[in-house]
Amino acid sequence: MLQVIFLGSGGIMPTRERNVPAIALRYKGEIILFDVGEGTIRQMNSAKLSPMRVEKIFITHFHGDHYLGLGGLIQTMNLWNREKPLHIYGPKYTFEFVQNFLNSGFFRPGFEVHVHELGETRLKFKDYEIWSFKVEHGIPALGYVFKEKDKRGKFLPEKLAQYGLRPGPILGKLEKDGKIEWNGQVIRLEDVTGPRRRGVKVVYTGDTEPCERVRLFAERADLLIHDATYLSDGDRGDSYHSTVEEACETARRAKVKLLALFHRAFRYTYDEYLSGASKICQETGVNFVIPRDFDVLTYKSGEWKRENLLEEGK
């Protein structure tokens, strides 16, 4: 099971209803943060997410609404006597900005902070990978892909029966080693399992104009969290952001399962934005959501379920 928790769903500045961008991805007990806008630690407290479970932070770019919560988050970790290292990833200048935080005031963390400046790369971890790709925002900026590793196919009862295998330690050994000797023959894992199952894929663009790289990296994503700051091109002006229509078109072309319209400009109320976005997305046939603060998208058995932590009283 994987969960995407929207700690801050607004853009540019906080409002009474929405905080600035911060997204937590919860997977197998780990919390991965994508952007840490001002007040992220408070949002985590409200969502009952422990900062001590955060091992990796991925920052898309260094406009204040996407990273100013980093200092408070690190200091809170220190107050809680954190010992394990923290890894911070981001575009060019990440090292400089993080060092500025660490050198400000009378504060030194009691744990290691490792900074990684990225271009376009693929980071491999135990059960998943993180891919970074360049987006168009007028400054060094990255989008990110979380890609769970593909899983083995399910054991096929008829194949197990064919080889005289039953559930138990022997199947555990087969899964671990990839093959076993049984009744005088070698049985491989693929002999008794179905097709490999594709791991879940989540893409976050950060702030960006429409660009072909997003479509390429979002191909067949289960969830695309796309900058959709404005309802219309006329509202955009000279900013390096996307409209709802542009986000929908990217999702349609990339054959995305679910589109999350993110970074809504503070000029729009939720109802106003929902009304306008619904018309646009329905015309393109895109399945979409407009996240609010503390919305949770849970991916299980190939489907997304949406709930809100505060409304559910969790």
UniProtKB/Swiss-Prot annotation:
GO molecular function: 3'-tRNA processing endoribonuclease activity; zinc ion binding
Active-site annotation: D65 (proton acceptor)
EC annotation from Swiss-Prot or TrEMBL: 3.1.26.11
Pfam families (alphabetical): Lactamase_B (PF00753), Lactamase_B_2 (PF12706)
CDD domains documented for this protein: RNaseZ_ZiPD-like_MBL-fold
Gene3D superfamilies xref list: Ribonuclease Z/Hydroxyacylglutathione hydrolase-like
Coiled coil: none
Tagged with keyword Metal-binding: yes
Binding site for Zn(2+) 2: D65, H66, D207, H263
Reactions this protein catalyses: Endonucleolytic cleavage of RNA, removing extra 3' nucleotides from tRNA precursor, generating 3' termini of tRNAs. A 3'-hydroxy group is left at the tRNA terminus and a 5'-phosphoryl group is left at the trailer molecule
Binding annotation for Zn(2+) 1: H61, H63, H137, D207
Keyword tags: Endonuclease, Hydrolase, Metal-binding, Nuclease, tRNA processing, Zinc
Cofactor note: Binds 2 Zn(2+) ions.
Cofactor: Zn(2+)
InterPro entries from the UniProt entry: Metallo-B-lactamas, RibonucZ/Hydroxyglut_hydro, RNase_Z/BN
HAMAP family (UniProt xref): RNase_Z_BN (MF_01818)
Quaternary state and interactors: Homodimer.
Protein role: Zinc phosphodiesterase, which displays some tRNA 3'-processing endonuclease activity. Probably involved in tRNA maturation, by removing a 3'-trailer from precursor tRNA.
Family, as annotated: Belongs to the RNase Z family.
Name of the protein in its database record: Ribonuclease Z
Annotated organism of origin: Thermococcus gammatolerans (strain DSM 15229 / JCM 11827 / EJ3)
